[in-house]
Curated annotation (Swiss-Prot):
Gene: PFK2
Cofactor(s) annotated in UniProt: Mg(2+)
Taxonomic path: Eukaryota, Viridiplantae, Streptophyta, Embryophyta, Tracheophyta
Binding site for Mg(2+): 175
Protein name as annotated: ATP-dependent 6-phosphofructokinase 2
InterPro entries to which the protein is assigned, alphabetical: ATP_PFK, PFKA, Phosphofructokinase_dom, PKF_sf, PyroP-dep_PFK_TP0108
Length: 444
């Protein structure tokens, strides 16, 4: 019996008229059989199955790409582009490619950048954009449009979208931004506004679910190598030296994991998904002492969200939230440096010991995207444009198993991509570092 396939339904605008895709007349495209994506073209969420098992239900998403017919008259489009949340390599590339794609592929001429995140919709003047204005933005770090956290006032934002006549809204942001975008999408639907909305997934932590990866992640891993290499040199050049590197990753340890596997200089990698302990048999201190005796140095990589429950904090710190509503994390790197020094002074008061702490957070996220991420940002931007022009709304474009798809925004906003400490990749980390299996030691 054939497996049943469940295709995730995409929201679409019903009040617009079908029209011929202007790509038919674009001098750089020669549409042939297979060029246009059809409603029956889908991407499977999972490509590996147990062939010996009985029929398994399969989940699929609509494939991204240009449609033979579009739902917008390009001359009537007024598009808004906004960047929200923290910086991430590739933000300017996405903006550039949205502008160039709308202009060159579909002939859209009314394209506006919204400054300073969500609050810019109702409190700042939009910036008119065209290919000439953005031609070199992909070479710059940060976001030329500026960004901010917070400022999410739903009614003010949707009022501004309506009053300014925007009928396409392209939002570049991470998990908090997506939760806000879900509310904007619902309010737009409630008001029955014919506005297409999409979110290009941005998070350097790579914690967006369903898609293969978020843009900027590969650049971040590449930049993290420099910090780890520096920590290794510092540790190796000292007597009983420890190089301590804190990498981004509030709730997931993907950057720390991939940077550890890539560098091969790391002796221990600590991530939010894995609990650890310091004292006693099988603890971190015992492991580090053994490593220092064997090699004279060690390199420790820790994701910013690891060990947060171990850091002492007062009542006000427990309740503290940032403007996006996220819990404020204490600096695990500063705490680690302190407890490592206290441990060594207690156990080996007469021996030399050095901890060199490196926090490359702002260096990593503020750089321009590398070549791989630049190409990825282009594909994401163009996928978003094709989807909105086809009349879809409330979706996220992204690769699933290497193929680009459209995923319902609400589904992505509710999903988190965390490191699976039971799979082969985490086992690979432990085989490279030879670090303890803290979980097994605790249970044992």
């Amino acid at each position: 019996m054939a497996a049943e396939t469940s295709i995730r339904k995409l929201p679409s605008l019903s009040g617009l008229r079908h029209r011929r895709n202007p790509l038919e007349d674009n001098p750089y495209f020669h549409p042939s059989n297979g060029f246009y994506i059809t409603p029956s073209d889908v991407i499977l969420a999972q490509v590996a199955y147990d062939h010996s098992a009985h029929s398994q239900s399969r989940v699929a998403y609509h494939r991204a790409g240009p449609r033979r017919e579009i739902m917008y008259e390009p001359s009537a489009v007024k598009a808004a582009i906004v960047t929200c949340g923290g910086l991430c390599p590739g933000m300017n590339t996405v903006i550039r490619e949205l502008v160039v794609g709308l202009w060159e592929l579909y002939g859209v001429r009314e394209i506006y950048g919204i400054p300073a995140g969500y609050r810019g919709f109702y409190s700042m003047k939009a910036v008119k954009l065209d290919p000439k204005a953005v031609h070199d933005w992909h070479k710059k770090g940060g976001t030329v449009l500026a960004t901010s956290r917070g400022g999410f006032h739903l009614q003010k934002i949707v009022d501004a979208i309506h009053l300014n006549g925007y009928n396409q809204v392209y939002i570049i942001g991470g998990d908090g931004t997506m939760r806000g975008a879900v509310e904007i999408f619902k309010e737009i639907s409630l008001r029955k506004l014919e506005v297409g909305i999409t979110v290009i997934p941005k998070t350097v932590d790579n914690d967006v679910g369903i898609i293969d990866r978020s843009f900027g992640f590969q650049t971040a891993v590449e930049m993290a190598q420099e910090a780890i290499s520096a920590a290794h040199v510092e540790a190796e050049s000292a007597v009983n030296g420890i190089g301590l590197v804190k990498l981004m990753g509030r709730s997931t340890g993907h950057i720390a994991l991939h940077a550890t596997l890539s560098s091969r200089d790391v002796d221990c990698c600590l991530i939010p998904e894995m609990d650890f302990y310091l004292e006693g048999k099988g603890g971190l201190f015992e492991f580090l002492e053994k490593r220092l005796k064997e090699r004279g140095h060690a390199v420790l990589v820790v994701a910013e969200g690891a060990g947060q429950e171990m850091i002492p904090r007062n009542e006000s710190q427990k309740q503290e939230r940032d403007e996006s509503g996220n819990a404020v994390f204490l600096d695990v790197g500063v705490w680690f440096k302190s407890v490592l020094k206290a441990w060594w002074e207690r156990e080996h008061p007469d021996e030399l010991f050095t901890v060199k702490y490196i926090d490359p957070t702002y260096m990593i996220r503020a750089v321009p995207a590398n070549a791989t991420d630049n190409l990825y940002c282009t594909l994401l931007a163009h996928s978003a444009i094709h989807g909105v022009m086809a009349g879809y709304t409330g979706f996220v474009p992204g690769p699933i198993n290497g193929n680009y798809a459209y995923i319902p925004l609400e589904e992505v906003a509710q999903t988190k991509n965390q490191v699976n400490t039971r799979d082969h990749k985490w086992a690979w980390v432990r085989s490279v570092t030879n670090q303890p299996d803290f979980e097994t030691n605790v249970k044992g």
